[in-house]
Amino acid sequence: MKKNLTFFMVIALLFTITPNVYAMHIAEGFLPPMWSGVYFVISAPFIIIGLKQIRERAKDNKDIKMLLGLVAAYAFILSAMKIPSVTGSCSHPTGTGLSAIIFGPFISAIVGLIVLIFQAILLAHGGITTLGANTLSMGIMGPIVSYLIYRGFKNKNQKVAVFLAATLGDLFTYFITSVQLALAFPAQQGGIAASFAKFFSIFSITQIPLAIMEGILTVIIFEFVMKYASKEIEVLGGVRK
């Protein structure tokens, strides 16, 4: 299992070497300080619970950390593929649907946070001041939707459940990002509602096809994980065929 996951992660790192330097989600300094602080506070409890869950589950099987690294690498790859969209932001897959399906929403918050920190520091995508806002949308709210959808549909058709979870979780991430931007920058005419409609409609043009592609790719990667990390999946107890 370790050899297979190590190979996958090496390939993943090769794909992350990219000349593109677009802002990831909401760019550094783009949000007013008050809103940046609010999103840090909201995200904090999820991060704390996620850290506790990782420690507890790693006691049963140390290879779970390797699996966690795999899903983090997957999220890093997808979220590095960017298409410029709204001023101060961009569209891209999120990749956190896979971690939500395998680990649940709280550990996915850690995955999202790690990916966002590395991209902010190494690739100048996103930023530190907007880390709370971006973690809330990509690492928390999107994965919550992915997790709930997967749990609701997995007993009917697992592949369909994975596809819907990844696709709709991606779209909900941008729904939340649009809300965040609308709250920070309400339109002079129409206020928050008009601002949200503008942001989300522009996001949707590029995000809907990206979300569908992410859903398809997540099904493929999920099958790979189920094949080569079945023991770790059993320890987690969240994924059942």
Curated annotation (Swiss-Prot):
Pathway terms, separated by semicolons: Cofactor biosynthesis; adenosylcobalamin biosynthesis
Example of a GO MF term: cobalt ion transmembrane transporter activity
Major site of localization recorded for this protein: membrane
Disulfide cysteine pairs (residue numbers): none
Gene Ontology CC: one annotated term: ATP-binding cassette (ABC) transporter complex
Keywords (A to Z) from UniProt: Cell membrane, Cobalamin biosynthesis, Cobalt, Cobalt transport, Ion transport, Membrane, Signal, Transmembrane, Transmembrane helix, Transport
Gene3D superfamilies to which the protein is assigned, alphabetical: 1.10.1760.20
Transmembrane segments: 29-49, 66-86, 98-118, 121-141, 160-180, 202-222
Protein name per Swiss-Prot or TrEMBL: Cobalt transport protein CbiM
Organism: Clostridium tetani (strain Massachusetts / E88)
Gene for this chain: cbiM
